[in-house]
Amino acid sequence: MRKDYLMTPGPTPVPAEVLLTMAAPIIHHRTPDFSAAFAESIAGLKYVFDTEGDVLLFASSGTGVMEAAIANCFCVGDTVVVCRNGKFGDRQKQIAEVYGLNVVDLHYEWTSVVDPADVATALEENPGVRGVIVTQSETSSGVLNDVKAIGAIVAEYPETVLIVDSITGIGAVECKTDEWGLDVVMTGSQKGLMLPPGLAACTVSKKAWRAYARSTLPKFYFDWMRYQKNVEKDTTPFTPAVSLVLGLNVALKMIREEGLENTIARHSRLAEATRRGCEALGLKLFAPPEGRGSAVTPVWVPAGIDGKAIVKMMKSEYGVTIAGGQDDYAGRIFRVGHLGYFGDFDIITTLAALEMTLAKLGYEFERGSGIKAAESVFMEG
């Protein structure tokens, strides 16, 4: 018998309370019971998004809600600034181009943060920009971009919306939607919300609704107004993922019980323990010190070691599933997720499995040093 540990940045582990709720007999979505759970879920999402504005919930992946943001805010030929320093910034650019937008491309290495000064310059040099699109927590690289600073810049442009991909940010890092002037913020269920994949949500500010009013891009399933009119009646325009919504309600109540500030602090502690543990093993962190998020820790594979073998052996021999690198970094980095339903001993277990794996693969280090470093973080409180 072996216990498995899912230590990826998505999907993430699902609490037993949520699983039990989703395993209950299905209910119809046009009933008072579902409407009550749906209304509570919307209220809970507003809590984790830290917004008093509108929140919409979709049966889709995170990519779906990314596409929805573009389809609802722009017209063919509109100019948008896309900030990209990872795979999901790249995806935003691809979606924008598919919809016929003119992209001002702020492209950085995956190991770099987006510079807010570059956003300011792009807005100054390109009059009439209708949107700025940026990833807050870049899942592929572990980089955390300063959307607060970018929000302050975009706020000076009344016709420019700021769209933020916080799919691995919400619930893991601070994201003050209203206070920071973020017009559209997106997340997915399989990340910090502690659910299986299948739901995605976004905020819509008053400025974003003004952008919607002028948008002429085609939309049907992802038409924001269809959802908003139904949210006001505690229902959905189309058949929802009923069991996922019921599970979402439970998961959001768990976050409320812990308290959002405490939830974010827990993620920060888990991330710091993971980073210190890896560094104690002599491993190099991928994300720069000035921009490390709390959702995932990417680590360079040491010279002479097969990166894919690390991922494979940790799963096959120790039941610990971590993620490999993506695109050009496949086999060159591995990624440890600590996003959502994780505690201190998940990190200890993962570092123990990593140590044993590295030792078997011939990497030389002081055995136990990674675990000891992580324990020090947890004992510091």
What are these regions (language model features)?
Residues 114-171:
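Active-site phosphate-binding strand-loop segment of PLP-dependent enzymes
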Residues 328, 332-381:
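PLP-dependent enzyme catalytic core of the Aspartate aminotransferase-like
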Residues 284-317:
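Conserved PLP-binding catalytic core of the aspartate aminotransferase-like
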Residues 52-81, 85, 89-93:
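Conserved beta-loop-alpha segment that forms the PLP phosphate-binding cup at the N-terminus of a helix
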Residues 13-14, 190-280, 381:
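Active-site C-terminal subdomain of aminotransferase-like
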Residues 3-59, 63:
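A glycine-/small-polar-enriched, mobile loop at the entrance of the PLP active site in fold-type I
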